[in-house]
């Protein structure tokens, strides 16, 4: 048995309810990586690529059928512990955005404020301002390509 990572949504991908911590989930039928079976990832970052929701689980895997560098598929899996990491994901996204903010010619103050503070009361305004700026930049690029004035 091996411990790995897995994100869950409201239900399993096949519609079954998420089992309680410590309860074994078993797959019947063929177990083929990227097709059928119970999957898990080697690192939380790898698991994030397949995340159907913000709840990250530390899982124990048994009867492993196939393995790749980033993931595996098994017949039996159980959740050891889980946590809703929504706030951690939002914080990480804001930090990633700030790491490239120097590429943004003139970011609106509300965008900078949100990225630096995570203040939910200004998130919608920041999203709208960033969207407006992105659309303006895209339009300018297309107008230039077509030889038209903005």
How would you describe each model-predicted region?
Residues 1-150:
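Short, glycine-biased loop/turn motifs at secondary-structure junctions and
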